[in-house]
Amino acid sequence: MATETNGADVAASSPGMPQLDFSTWGNQIFWLVITLVIIYMVLSKVALPRIAAILSERQGTITNDIATAEDFKAKAKDAEAAYEKALADARAEAQRIVAEAKADIQSDLDVAISKADAEIAAKAAESEKAIAEIRAGAAEAIQQVAKDTAQEIVATFGGKADAKAVDAAVDGQLKG
């Protein structure tokens, strides 16, 4: 019990928390300054250079990535321009091929049309010639039939038909 009583006396005689005991503040401030200086030295010599190196490396990586992205963007623009040019060239080539094909087809068509026109003209001339021959033949046939009919009519009425008179009468009627 003596120790308990002695501990109780010490507790009763001490002013409270040791940090708030003004008699030890000088020592506390000294050790606080020493601790802060040591922490500052450790941070400035070890931790802060590592952090600065990491931040610098990160900034370099970001800068390199941005530069790479800009290069890729420029390459993409160049590729797009090359694509557009190739597309325009292909369209121009296609239009040229279409124009050539149209010209070839038109020339073939013109040749075929002129050939068909020549054939039609030749057949029309042949047909006109045949029609003229048929008309001439028909006119002669009509003339002969008219003469024969006139002779038969005269013979039917009891007269004797003079061939020269019948020919002259039929020719006169047919001509005018």
Swiss-Prot record:
Q: Which InterPro entries match?
A: ATP_synth_b/b'su_bac/chlpt (IPR002146), ATP_synthase_B_chain (IPR050059)
Question: Which keywords are on file for this protein?
Answer: ATP synthesis, Cell inner membrane, Cell membrane, CF(0), Hydrogen ion transport, Ion transport, Membrane, Transmembrane, Transmembrane helix, Transport
Xref: CDD domains: ATP-synt_Fo_b
Q: How does it sit in the membrane?
A: Single-pass membrane protein
Q: Could you list the residue ranges that cross the membrane?
A: 29-49
Q: State whether keyword Cell membrane applies.
A: yes
What GO annotations for molecular function exist for this entry?
proton-transporting ATP synthase activity, rotational mechanism; proton-transporting ATPase activity, rotational mechanism
Write down the superkingdom of origin. Bacteria
Keyword tRNA-binding tagged = no
User: What would be one Gene Ontology cellular-component term for the protein?
Assistant: proton-transporting ATP synthase complex
Task: Give the matching Pfam families.
Answer: ATP-synt_B
Q: Where in the cell is it found?
A: Cell inner membrane
What is the annotated quaternary arrangement, including any partners?
A: F-type ATPases have 2 components, F(1) - the catalytic core - and F(0) - the membrane proton channel. F(1) has five subunits: alpha(3), beta(3), gamma(1), delta(1), epsilon(1). F(0) has three main subunits: a(1), b(2) and c(10-14). The alpha and beta chains form an alternating ring which encloses part of the gamma chain. F(1) is attached to F(0) by a central stalk formed by the gamma and epsilon chains, while a peripheral stalk is formed by the delta and b chains.
State the function annotated in the UniProt record: F(1)F(0) ATP synthase produces ATP from ADP in the presence of a proton or sodium gradient. F-type ATPases consist of two structural domains, F(1) containing the extramembraneous catalytic core and F(0) containing the membrane proton channel, linked together by a central stalk and a peripheral stalk. During catalysis, ATP synthesis in the catalytic domain of F(1) is coupled via a rotary mechanism of the central stalk subunits to proton translocation. Component of the F(0) channel, it forms part of the peripheral stalk, linking F(1) to F(0). The b'-subunit is a diverged and duplicated form of b found in plants and photosynthetic bacteria.
Q: Member of which family? A: Belongs to the ATPase B chain family.
Name of this chain's protein:
ATP synthase subunit b 2
Origin species, per record, is Roseobacter denitrificans (strain ATCC 33942 / OCh 114)
Q: What is the lineage of its organism?
A: Bacteria, Pseudomonadati, Pseudomonadota, Alphaproteobacteria, Rhodobacterales
